[in-house]
Amino acid sequence: MRRAIPAVMALAWLAACAKEAPPPAEEVNTGHADSVAMAAEMFDTTAFDTVTWRTPDEALSRGGLVFRVSCNKCHGVMGNGDGDLVADGKSAKPGSFLADSWKYADDPMGLRKAIFTGSAQDMPYWGLVGLKYRDLDAVASYISDYLRPTFMEQAGTP
Protein backbone atom coordinates (compact mmCIF):
# COMPACT_ATOMS: atom_id res chain seq x y z
CA MET A 1 0.00 0.00 0.00
CA ARG A 2 2.79 2.42 0.90
CA ARG A 3 4.46 1.83 -2.48
CA ALA A 4 1.26 2.77 -4.32
CA ILE A 5 0.97 6.19 -2.68
CA PRO A 6 3.94 7.78 -4.56
CA ALA A 7 2.64 6.39 -7.86
CA VAL A 8 -0.87 7.75 -7.23
CA MET A 9 0.57 11.13 -6.23
CA ALA A 10 2.70 11.24 -9.38
CA LEU A 11 -0.32 10.49 -11.56
CA ALA A 12 -2.37 13.15 -9.78
CA TRP A 13 0.42 15.69 -10.28
CA LEU A 14 0.72 14.85 -14.00
CA ALA A 15 -3.04 15.13 -14.44
CA ALA A 16 -3.04 18.54 -12.75
CA CYS A 17 -0.28 19.76 -15.07
CA ALA A 18 -1.98 18.61 -18.27
CA LYS A 19 -3.09 21.44 -20.54
CA GLU A 20 -6.77 21.95 -21.06
CA ALA A 21 -8.04 22.05 -24.61
CA PRO A 22 -8.81 25.58 -25.80
CA PRO A 23 -12.49 26.49 -25.79
CA PRO A 24 -14.38 26.00 -29.05
CA ALA A 25 -14.35 29.00 -31.42
CA GLU A 26 -18.06 29.58 -30.82
CA GLU A 27 -17.42 30.12 -27.10
CA VAL A 28 -14.57 32.53 -27.80
CA ASN A 29 -16.69 34.52 -30.28
CA THR A 30 -19.63 34.58 -27.88
CA GLY A 31 -17.37 35.75 -25.07
CA HIS A 32 -15.93 38.51 -27.27
CA ALA A 33 -19.41 39.61 -28.36
CA ASP A 34 -20.53 39.67 -24.71
CA SER A 35 -17.56 41.87 -23.82
CA VAL A 36 -18.31 44.21 -26.74
CA ALA A 37 -21.89 44.51 -25.49
CA MET A 38 -20.67 45.17 -21.95
CA ALA A 39 -18.27 47.85 -23.24
CA ALA A 40 -21.12 49.51 -25.15
CA GLU A 41 -23.14 49.69 -21.94
CA MET A 42 -20.20 51.14 -20.00
CA PHE A 43 -19.25 53.81 -22.56
CA ASP A 44 -19.77 57.27 -21.07
CA THR A 45 -19.71 60.28 -23.40
CA THR A 46 -19.48 62.67 -20.44
CA ALA A 47 -16.07 61.25 -19.49
CA PHE A 48 -14.61 63.20 -22.41
CA ASP A 49 -15.80 66.48 -20.87
CA THR A 50 -12.91 66.29 -18.41
CA VAL A 51 -10.22 65.50 -21.02
CA THR A 52 -8.09 68.56 -21.72
CA TRP A 53 -4.90 69.11 -23.68
CA ARG A 54 -2.44 71.98 -23.34
CA THR A 55 -2.21 72.17 -27.13
CA PRO A 56 -3.71 70.27 -30.07
CA ASP A 57 -0.19 69.01 -30.82
CA GLU A 58 -0.04 67.36 -27.39
CA ALA A 59 -3.18 65.37 -28.21
CA LEU A 60 -1.85 64.42 -31.66
CA SER A 61 1.50 63.34 -30.22
CA ARG A 62 -0.16 61.15 -27.60
CA GLY A 63 -2.62 59.84 -30.17
CA GLY A 64 0.21 58.91 -32.54
CA LEU A 65 1.88 56.92 -29.78
CA VAL A 66 -1.35 55.11 -28.87
CA PHE A 67 -1.99 54.37 -32.56
CA ARG A 68 1.49 52.90 -33.07
CA VAL A 69 1.19 50.71 -29.97
CA SER A 70 -2.47 49.66 -30.13
CA CYS A 71 -3.87 50.16 -33.64
CA ASN A 72 -1.07 49.97 -36.20
CA LYS A 73 -0.74 46.19 -36.09
CA CYS A 74 -4.20 45.74 -37.65
CA HIS A 75 -5.01 49.10 -39.25
CA GLY A 76 -1.54 49.70 -40.73
CA VAL A 77 0.59 52.84 -40.77
CA MET A 78 -1.82 54.82 -42.95
CA GLY A 79 -5.06 53.32 -41.62
CA ASN A 80 -5.82 51.27 -44.74
CA GLY A 81 -6.43 48.08 -42.77
CA ASP A 82 -3.21 46.47 -43.97
CA GLY A 83 -1.28 46.01 -40.72
CA ASP A 84 1.06 43.14 -39.95
CA LEU A 85 -1.57 40.99 -38.20
CA VAL A 86 -3.82 41.30 -41.25
CA ALA A 87 -0.96 40.49 -43.64
CA ASP A 88 -0.09 37.43 -41.54
CA GLY A 89 -3.71 36.25 -41.59
CA LYS A 90 -4.08 36.62 -37.82
CA SER A 91 -6.78 39.28 -37.99
CA ALA A 92 -9.70 40.17 -40.22
CA LYS A 93 -9.11 43.21 -42.42
CA PRO A 94 -10.60 46.29 -40.75
CA GLY A 95 -12.19 49.04 -42.78
CA SER A 96 -9.98 51.79 -44.13
CA PHE A 97 -9.98 55.18 -42.44
CA LEU A 98 -9.28 56.62 -45.90
CA ALA A 99 -12.42 55.30 -47.60
CA ASP A 100 -14.78 58.02 -48.82
CA SER A 101 -17.60 56.16 -47.09
CA TRP A 102 -15.79 55.84 -43.73
CA LYS A 103 -18.66 56.13 -41.26
CA TYR A 104 -16.76 58.08 -38.60
CA ALA A 105 -15.49 60.84 -40.91
CA ASP A 106 -17.83 63.38 -39.33
CA ASP A 107 -18.60 61.58 -36.07
CA PRO A 108 -15.82 62.04 -33.47
CA MET A 109 -17.92 60.64 -30.61
CA GLY A 110 -18.89 57.65 -32.73
CA LEU A 111 -15.20 57.01 -33.39
CA ARG A 112 -14.40 57.22 -29.68
CA LYS A 113 -17.20 54.77 -28.92
CA ALA A 114 -16.04 52.37 -31.66
CA ILE A 115 -12.52 52.37 -30.19
CA PHE A 116 -13.87 51.90 -26.66
CA THR A 117 -16.27 49.06 -27.50
CA GLY A 118 -14.40 47.27 -30.28
CA SER A 119 -16.36 45.05 -32.64
CA ALA A 120 -17.78 41.56 -32.70
CA GLN A 121 -15.43 40.74 -35.60
CA ASP A 122 -11.88 41.20 -34.28
CA MET A 123 -11.33 44.68 -32.88
CA PRO A 124 -10.42 44.67 -29.19
CA TYR A 125 -12.73 46.46 -26.75
CA TRP A 126 -9.99 48.93 -25.82
CA GLY A 127 -12.07 50.67 -23.17
CA LEU A 128 -12.14 47.47 -21.12
CA VAL A 129 -8.58 46.32 -21.73
CA GLY A 130 -6.25 49.20 -21.25
CA LEU A 131 -7.02 52.52 -22.90
CA LYS A 132 -8.21 55.30 -20.65
CA TYR A 133 -10.61 57.97 -21.92
CA ARG A 134 -7.69 60.37 -22.39
CA ASP A 135 -5.94 57.86 -24.70
CA LEU A 136 -9.20 57.19 -26.55
CA ASP A 137 -9.63 60.92 -27.12
CA ALA A 138 -6.02 61.27 -28.27
CA VAL A 139 -6.09 58.38 -30.75
CA ALA A 140 -9.47 59.46 -32.14
CA SER A 141 -8.04 62.95 -32.69
CA TYR A 142 -4.93 61.49 -34.30
CA ILE A 143 -7.01 59.40 -36.71
CA SER A 144 -9.53 62.10 -37.66
CA ASP A 145 -7.40 65.25 -37.44
CA TYR A 146 -4.03 63.99 -38.69
CA LEU A 147 -3.90 60.52 -40.20
CA ARG A 148 -7.01 60.64 -42.39
CA PRO A 149 -6.48 64.17 -43.79
CA THR A 150 -2.74 63.67 -44.32
CA PHE A 151 -2.98 60.44 -46.27
CA MET A 152 -6.11 61.47 -48.18
CA GLU A 153 -4.26 64.60 -49.29
CA GLN A 154 -1.30 62.49 -50.40
CA ALA A 155 -3.70 60.29 -52.36
CA GLY A 156 -5.19 63.39 -54.00
CA THR A 157 -8.57 63.05 -52.31
CA PRO A 158 -9.98 66.28 -50.82
List each language-model region with its residue ranges.
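Sec-dependent bacterial lipoprotein signal peptides
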Residues: 1-15
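Bacterial signal peptide processing site
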Residues: 17-20
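Electrostatic cytochrome c docking/interface patches
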Residues: 27-66, 156-158
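Short glycine/proline- and charge-enriched loop/turn segments
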Residues: 44-48, 88-96
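Solvent-exposed, polar/charged alpha-helical surfaces in well-ordered, non-transmembrane soluble domains
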Residues: 61-69, 95, 109, 113, ...
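Periplasmic/extracellular electron-transfer cofactor-ligation site
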Residues: 64, 68-91, 117-125, 146-152
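Electron-transfer interface patches adjacent to heme c in soluble/periplasmic c-type cytochromes
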Residues: 92-110, 125-137
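Axial heme c-ligation environment in periplasmic c-type cytochrome domains
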Residues: 114-146
